[in-house]
A protein has these predicted regions:
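Carbohydrate transferase catalytic cores enriched for Leloir-type hexosyltransferases
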Residues: 1-339
Length: 339
C-alpha cells in the first residue's frame, strides 16, 4: 500500500506547481494509494512493506514528530523533490521557505528513495548533500512530470489567429519575471507591433503587489494587455487555443511545467535559456532566449509574432514531438514502489 501525503495539497485553495504535481499523481495512483494528512494520519497503519510517499515541503517545526517518524522506519519512505530555489534565489523567495529549506533537504536524506523532477534539480539536491558531508543518502532518480495539465486530448492541429496573442502562465512574482516581460512588450507596442499579452496567475502575497500595479498601469495605456488572476483550467485551455505562442521568461525553475503544458496544447514556447528548461526545449517547439537579454527577447517575440514560417515550424514540432504524461509518471512510481 502507498500512503500518499496530501497534507497541504488536500486543502490548498490555489493551483501552484507543487499542488498540481500532488493532485495529478494522486489521480494517477488512485485505487493503489491512500491519501493521508499529517498529523491526523494513523501512522500505526503503515506496515513494514508499505510506502509513505510525499511530494510536499515540510520541516520538523511544521510537522512535530516527523524526524522521529523517519528515523523509526516503521515502513518505507519516498519523496519527490522539486527544487532548491529558496537557497539559490533567497532574495526573491518567501522568508519562511528560505528558513525551512535547509532542514527540508536534510530530512530528504533520511528517505529510502527520492525522485527529482528534473536532472538539474537532482544535481542541486546531490550537491547540497555533498556540501553537508552527509555520509548516507538515498538514491535519487528523475521523474518526468506530465505535460497534460487537463483532461483534454493533446492538440495536434493549430489554427492561426488574425491578431497574434501571447500567453504567460505563472504566479505573479519576481522569479517568474513578469516585470521584464512587461518592459519588453511595452517597447514592442511602442514600435507599432500589434499583439495581445495575456498573463495568468495569482499574486504572490509577499512579492507580487508591484507587478500587479505595473500590469494595471500598463493595461490602461495599452488595450492589448489582459490579466486573469483566478483562471480555471477550462479558461486557461481557451487562452491556449487562441495563443500564437506562450512566454516563459522565468529566472529559475524546478522543472518548468508551463513549457511542457504549452507544448501539450500545441503552442510554441519562447522561454529563458536555462539548463533546467533545456531538458524540455531540446525536443523542439521552443525558442530559448538568453536570460534577461532585452534585445534578444524583443527580437525573439517579434519573430514568433510576425514570421509565419518560423511559427509554423515551431508549431509542427510542438504538436508532433514526444511528451511525458501524468499517467506515465504515476506508472513510474507505481512500478518502483512495488519492489
Amino acid at each position: 500500500m502507498i500512503h500518499f501525503d496530501v497534507t497541504k495539497a488536500g486543502g490548498a485553495g490555489h493551483r501552484s506547481g507543487l499542488m498540481r504535481v500532488s493532485a495529478r499523481l494522486a489521480d494517477g495512483l488512485r485505487g493503489e494509494a491512500m491519501e493521508v494528512r499529517w498529523p491526523t494520519w494513523d501512522r500505526a497503519t503503515l506496515r513494514a512493506d508499505d510506502w509513505f510517499l510525499t511530494g510536499e515541503l515540510f520541516s520538523e517545526e511544521e510537522r512535530p514528530g516527523f524526524t522521529a517518524f523517519l528515523e523509526k522506519r516503521a515502513g518505507r519512505t519516498a519523496a519527490i523533490f522539486h527544487d532548491a530555489i529558496p537557497l539559490t534565489h533567497p532574495h526573491i523567495t518567501w522568508p519562511q521557505s528560505v528558513a525551512r529549506h535547509p532542514g527540508y533537504l536534510k530530512l530528504l536524506a533520511q528517505f529510502d528513495r527520492v525522485w527529482a523532477v528534473s536532472a538539474a534539480s537532482r544535481e542541486e539536491l546531490l550537491g547540497f548533500w555533498r556540501w553537508q558531508g552527509l555520509a548516507k543518502t538515498p538514491p535519487v532518480e528523475v521523474l518526468a512530470l506530465g505535460a497534460d495539465f487537463n483532461s483534454a486530448p493533446r492538440v495536434t492541429l493549430r489554427a492561426a489567429r488574425a491578431r497574434p496573442s501571447l500567453l504567460s502562465v505563472g504566479i505573479l512574482e519576481p522569479r517568474k519575471n513578469q516585470m521584464f516581460l512587461l518592459d519588453v512588450s511595452e517597447e514592442l507596442w511602442g514600435e507599432g507591433l500589434e499583439f495581445e499579452l495575456h498573463l495568468v496567475g495569482r499574486v504572490n502575497p509577499h512579492f507580487g503587489a508591484p507587478i500587479l500595479r505595473r500590469i494595471k498601469a500598463l493595461s490602461r495605456k495599452n488595450g492589448g494587455l489582459h490579466y486573469h488572476e483566478a483562471a480555471s483550467d477550462a479558461a486557461v485551455t481557451t487562452l491556449y487555443a487562441t495563443a500564437r505562442a506562450s512566454v516563459v521568461p522565468t529566472l529559475a525553475e524546478g522543472c518548468g511545467l508551463p513549457v511542457l503544458e504549452s507544448l501539450w496544447m500545441g503552442v510554441p514556447c519562447v522561454c529563458s535559456d536555462l539548463p533546467v528548461l533545456r531538458e524540455n526545449t531540446a525536443g523542439g517547439g521552443c525558442l530559448p532566449v538568453a536570460l534577461n537579454d532585452r534585445a534578444q527577447w524583443k527580437a525573439a517575440l517579434r519573430r514568433v509574432l510576425t514570421e509565419n514560417t518560423l511559427h509554423a515550424l515551431l508549431a509542427a514540432e510542438a504538436t508532433s514531438r514526444v511528451l511525458p504524461t501524468w499517467a506515465e509518471a504515476a506508472e513510474t512510481l507505481r512500478g518502483a514502489l512495488k519492489t
